[in-house]
Amino acid sequence: MIKHYQFILSELPIFAALINIQKSKKKKNMSIRKRMNVLFGTLLLTGSLFSQNVCVSTPETSLVLSAPVGGELKHVYYGDKLSEVDLQNINLTGTPDMPAYPVYGLNCPGESALAVKHADGNMTLQMEIVQVKTSKEENAEITAIELRDKVYPFYVNVYYKAYQDADVIEIWTEIRHQEKKPVILNQFASAFLPIRRGNVWLSHLYGSWANEGRLCQEALEPGMKVIKNKDGVRNSHTSHAEVMFSLDGKPQENAGCVIGAALCYSGNYKLRIDTHDDEYHRFFAGINEENSAYSLKKDEIFRTPELALTYSNEGLSGSSRNFHRWARLHKLAHGTVPRKILLNSWEGVYFDVNQAGMDQMMSDIASMGGELFVMDDGWFGDKYPRKNDSSSLGDWVVDKNKLPNGIEGLLKDAQKNGVKFGIWIEPEMANTTSEFYEKHPDWVIKAPERDVVQGRGGTQVVLDLANPQVQEFIFKIVDDLMSNYPEIDYIKWDANMSILNHGSNYLTKDNQSHMYIEFHRGFEKICQQIRAKYPDLTIQACASGGGRVNYGILPYFDEFWVSDNTDALQRIYMQWGTSYFFPAIAMASHISAAPNHQTFRTIPLKYRIDVAMSGRLGMEIQPKNMTEEEKTLCKNAIAEYKTIRPVVQLGDIYRLMSPYDKLGVASMMYVTPEKDKSVFYWWKTEHFVNQHLPRVKMAGLSPDKLYKVHELNRIDNDPLSFEGKTFSGAYLMANGLEIPYNHKVDYHKQNDYSSRVLWLEEVK
């Protein structure tokens, strides 16, 4: 709900007293004119303080702004939803004034959200409120606050979008001007949020290739904390554009007040947290302006990406649940449609794609209950067949030597085996060893007067997506596949290179600093065009693993590849961190081979299955190398996953015991909104003799309901002591269940890994 909050004057003591004075005939020493002047003056004073407050509300939160026309936009409050009484008095709490969107130039010695250079060289801004407008969309309410410079015809609209079916508020700006010549935007953050000083901790993600989504938690200390990306294409390998602030001490999963923030952008970003010796941490989020100064033409509108904010008094997991619900409903393609169980060919055959081998893999995944087969890299190239990563990108024609029956033959095989078919592409990239590059060397990103810097395979280059011809070429890759083979159900969209050359043959020499921004504008145009024509297509975002895990692209993509590292133990850590901001339905989590192809660690199949079942289950393996016993275990697991799939992919997450706490155990669970079903995961993460592991208490259940417990993926000779037994939600949340440290299996099957998946269902 969005309110221009108007006060009921008679409810305030000062007005009640004045009204009583006016009514009293005994106060003959005060003239009516004098009494009315006092009343009118008080009205003006109070109106200027309060009547222009704007309250932006979701079901459980409030964001309050002071927005007097002709005055400065101020931040007043963000947190738990306020009552009517609290709204009346929110300006009287003694809280220091803070700007809601600080600009550079006048009385601004600190960090700013917006800094420009006017056409006449003036570097200052002084913004005042012109008007406040509100509007409604389905399940959302929007307030737009228009700001204008006091001297120059320079405008900023600050937007607040409050979702009424999720506790998330999106903030963004639109910048425009009517000056005679271009204005240079040197800094253009999407949003600013002051956070009251206290024992505030920051949770954020970091990593690298094959080690994405690692969790870091730290107290905010004086100084500047900067989290930024300059990759150009992939923005979530080394850091993430999402953070959480725990407001009352060291972060807790299921207790404490938490603000979550996610910048919805696919390109270079910068998050700044400025802490000085005053009352606030100052948080800025937006596009990374480094090497990206933007020349804004008259009447052109520059829109910044949305910053999504959420607040929860139920700890980190509560903030995650808010993000997940918002994502499934609004920020993820087909976010409420359960995902298929698939087999991807990559770790099974790598580039060694062939017709018979693909048919066999389809047959194998079908026999285990899978629903989709995805042919990965290696299927294309004519003059330069794709035998490794050094050639062929850009030449999106079938290699007839590998696939003599073509894609149509594969589709027939898929139909025969009763599975859907998907295919891999990397459309934003090319190899210099390709027919494409021979025809269009000017379509790649390249610095003038410099040799082209090449990436993967020694020959890979990035296409210039600022160029409309390149945009059309990329769209046509997908359009040709889908037009010629409409039975294709799934596309894996990869991107395996950073921008290593700063230069665009399409942009003018004066606008070379626009390159990063225009690349992602072009990328979004392509995605919009594809989704407009193929709204039902499932698309995975892969970028050397988890390089494109962000809410800038997910409205167009159904899921993402968490990491090229499929090692089950390391995946626990990566998927744990990723779950802070992204729901399980979007996290592709695959059962792979042992020894693992990245870490060479040998992990038992049961453990690999139990980890993969905590996300969107799939397989990344060569089935013909599996034993019949292993295939049977996978077949049973797939059948059981189909039962729990709606709970895992659409349920509420409760993280219970973090692997980062190094207690020897990681544990989490998903619970339906109705609290009638739940899936509980327990993984042993450290292995020592005579360990003493903590007992894990459950969360999110109804204390008054009774739950029957059943173990999934059981390999033990004997059932667990509590198998089939019933417990109250109150008991399970207060005490948990004692999980055995090891599996009771035959001696030759003993190993140092242990994991359990429990299915809880309400007994009615």
Predicted regions: what they are:
Residues 53-65, 72-274, 290, 706-722, ...:
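Polysaccharide-binding surfaces and accessory modules of carbohydrate-active proteins
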Residues 60, 173, 299, 414, ...:
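Conserved, mostly hydrophobic/aromatic
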Residues 60, 243-245, 253, 659-703:
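Carbohydrate-binding surface patches
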Residues 105-127, 253-267, 311-332, 370-377, ...:
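Glycine-rich, aromatic-flanked loop segments that form ligand/cofactor-binding clefts
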Residues 124-128, 294-313, 753-761:
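Short Pro-Gly-centered flexible turn/kink motifs
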Residues 334-476, 485, 490:
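Aromatic-lined carbohydrate-binding/catalytic grooves of carbohydrate-active enzymes
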Residues 404-406, 438-440, 444-606, 616, ...:
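Active-site neighborhood of glycoside hydrolase catalytic domains
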Residues 686-764:
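C-terminal beta-sandwich/jelly-roll accessory domains of carbohydrate-active enzymes
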